[in-house]
Regions:
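A composition-driven surface/loop motif
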Residues: 1-190
């Protein structure tokens, strides 16, 4: 079991990154809890893998300190691959921000906690979702926030089952303009 927290106010880093790696990070199991904050910076990150992040199993929970102006739970400038496990990511701005994404399995929750967040899940350049259950939630019910954004989104063998509309999907942005159903869920087709 691993618990990771950014340092206290006296010695906190400027960027406020709880777990950072330049190279590839692979998580195959275990219980990992990351609580992130930044004392001297308006933005903080929970798990920041510059090159590549691969999750094959385990129970991963990433949660910000609610005093932040901006907080991104999971971010990678390269490839994000999720094959299994349970991954719960909370952010005040973006919950998940990745350049290339492939989700083939597991149970993934991305949730924005701040009403003023303009996005929940940014799978920026290309995203392919082929399995698992992927829930994207705007906890504060902001009707203007983009729940899922991708310039190239592929859903193969999975369905969007809640909270999205065809117009926004066509624009590669999945929105939900309403307060009754502030989330979308993508899961494997039966």
């Amino acid at each position: 079991d691993t618990y990771i927290k950014t340092a206290d106010e006296e010695v906190a880093s400027f960027m406020g990154v709880a777990l950072w790696t330049q190279d590839k990070m692979i998580i195959n199991g275990g219980d990992i809890a990351i609580h992130y904050t930044a004392s001297f910076s308006p933005i903080s990150y929970g798990l920041y893998s510059v090159s590549e992040l691969e999750i094959n199993g385990g129970n991963i929970h990433i949660n910000p300190d609610d005093s932040q102006l901006m907080a991104v739970g999971l971010i990678t400038s390269g490839q994000l691959t999720i094959n299994g496990g349970k991954v719960s990511v909370y952010g005040l701005d973006d919950a998940i921000n990745a350049k290339f994404t492939h989700i083939a399995g597991g149970e993934v929750l991305a949730q924005a906690l701040d009403y003023f967040a303009d996005g929940v899940c940014r799978l920026v350049t290309k995203a392919e979702i082929t399995g698992g259950v992927f829930t994207i939630s705007d906890m504060q019910h902001n009707p203007k926030s983009v729940k899922l954004f991708s310039n190239d989104l592929h859903l193969n063998g999975v369905s969007i089952v809640a909270g999205a509309n065809e117009t926004s999907v066509a624009k590669k942005e999945i929105n939900n303009y309403g307060y009754t159903d502030p989330y979308i869920r993508i899961e494997k087709e039966e």
